[in-house]
Amino acid sequence: MDKEKLKAIEAAMGNIEKQFGKGSVMKLGEKNILDIEAISTGCLGMDIALGIGGVPKGRIVEIYGPESSGKTTVALHIIAEAQKNGGVAAFIDAEHALDPSYARKLGVDIDNLIVSQPDTGEQGLEIAEALVRSNAIDIVVVDSVAALVPKAEIQGEMGDSHVGLQARLMSQALRKLAGSINKSNCVAIFINQLREKVGIMFGSPETTPGGRALKFYSSVRLDVRRIDTIKQGDEFLGNRTRVKVTKNKVAPPFKNAEFDIMYNEGISRTGDVLDLGVKEEIVQKSGSWFSYNDVRLGQGRENAKQFLKDNPELLYEIENTIREKYDLPIVKNNIKAEVEDKKEKKAEEV
């Protein structure tokens, strides 16, 4: 570059920093902006699909899908992972439907979880903004966008028309929130429902409420679907779930992850590791038998899952082999602490 041009740019950058503060303008190579930190989702398959080992810090994430597909479960697992690493989490419960006992079973520290149940959409988003601006929050979850009802709609009559009010509210809120979220390095997760457009002949009629702003501002969009029911005899044990990364600004998009969501347990870690182990040929499958090196894990998937649950050393070993393959952080073997935690939880339940 021309020396005079370089001097002029440096002078301009100096003036901008004087006026707007240090860090308001910089060269991309000076700061490791591209080294994006991530919070694990608590599901190895999903961490791999996201490409960076979890949801990106300082970004907006949208989780959407049909009813009872596992959207809130995924969000609660991310909160649990953030808290495990010493993070502070907030949950804006616009649906007024958060179940504390279920959250605890998923590993959420509910004693230190900041919860708000706002009366209006404006109030909920203002609370979220205040928490993000405090720079003390690592993750904030809004459940859900569809339940963020504008004040005018709440105060109006039941049959009144309020066209575009929620979309305007979301657009204005995200314009204000986006910069604060990035500066505070906080993850903002918006859970969203599905709606169907009327009269669509071609293409998907499915859409998400709250306008288009959230689609634009989100760095990651996750489509959560229930694809099957897990049964043992006549007993229903859980759901088989598929997550598709429909938008990803931090890694290649359109990757899928499939895992089990077990009732009263959440995402099955053993099932996730077992499936990935078979996929990566770390775990051998012969007929209905699963084996790892010389160890027989069991006949049938559920029996193999139970064997890994009873032998956490083996589970860690298989998981870390998969993590090494994808350059993800290695999980420390903290079996004694985990066993004690499980005993404490069982004692509390009794």
Swiss-Prot record:
The UniProt record lists the keyword RNA-binding: no
Top-level division of the source organism's lineage: Bacteria
Keyword match DNA-binding: yes
InterPro entries: AAA+_ATPase, DNA_recomb/repair_RecA, DNA_recomb/repair_RecA_CS, P-loop_NTPase, RecA-like_C, RecA-like_N, RecA_ATP-bd, RecA_C_sf
Main location: cytoplasm
Binding site for ATP: 65-72
CDD domains hit by this protein: RecA (cd00983)
One term under GO cellular component: cytosol
PANTHER family linked: MITOCHONDRIAL DNA REPAIR PROTEIN RECA HOMOLOG-RELATED, RECA
Function: Can catalyze the hydrolysis of ATP in the presence of single-stranded DNA, the ATP-dependent uptake of single-stranded DNA by duplex DNA, and the ATP-dependent hybridization of homologous single-stranded DNAs. It interacts with LexA causing its activation and leading to its autocatalytic cleavage.
Stated family: Belongs to the RecA family.
Protein's recorded name: Protein RecA
Record organism: Clostridium tetani (strain Massachusetts / E88)
